[in-house]
Amino acid sequence: MKYFVVALALVAAFACIAESKPAESEHELAEVEEENELADLEDAVWLEHLADLSDLEEARGFFGNTWKKIKGKADKIMLKKAVKLMVKKEGISKEEAQAKVDAMSKKQIRLYLLKYYGKKALQKASEKL
């Protein structure tokens, strides 16, 4: 259970990274510098910081591809977990559960799993108290 929650948190973190807005390119920074005729030291520091972000674009490309692979595997695992839970919880056959899961969207599957594991975690926490 702990590993599933940690994996889910990592998937959410990688989703935020992959969907973040791309940094400005060095060419755009040069145009901004020419337009504003930087005399203020704070503006120069800000532009220098943005110039360093071009390295992040390369890293984002690497993590974007890695993220897609991780997300694909996580989706497959979630589908299998959802089918197993439906079979166990509702007492239906594996084929019926698979048909129900196939009809659900990815968001609905995530909510179904989070609801189940959230209740389970809450029960364990209340038992410890």
Swiss-Prot record:
Motif (Processing quadruplet motif) on chain: 57-60
GO BP terms: defense response to Gram-negative bacterium; defense response to Gram-positive bacterium; killing of cells of another organism
Main location: secreted
Top-level taxon of origin: Eukaryota
Propeptide regions on this chain: 21-60
Keyword Methyltransferase (UniProt): no
Reported modifications of this chain: Cleavage of the propeptide depends on the processing quadruplet motif (XXXR, with at least one of X being E).
Tissue: Expressed by the venom gland.
Leader sequence residues: 1-20
InterPro entries given in the database record: Latarcin_precursor (IPR018802)
The keyword Signal belongs to this UniProt entry's keyword annotation: yes
Annotated family: Belongs to the cationic peptide 06 (cytoinsectotoxin) family.
Described purpose of this protein according to its UniProt entry: Insecticidal, cytolytic and antimicrobial peptide. Forms voltage-dependent, ion-permeable channels in membranes. At high concentration causes cell membrane lysis.
Protein name per Swiss-Prot or TrEMBL: M-zodatoxin-Lt8b
Taxonomic source organism: Lachesana tarabaevi
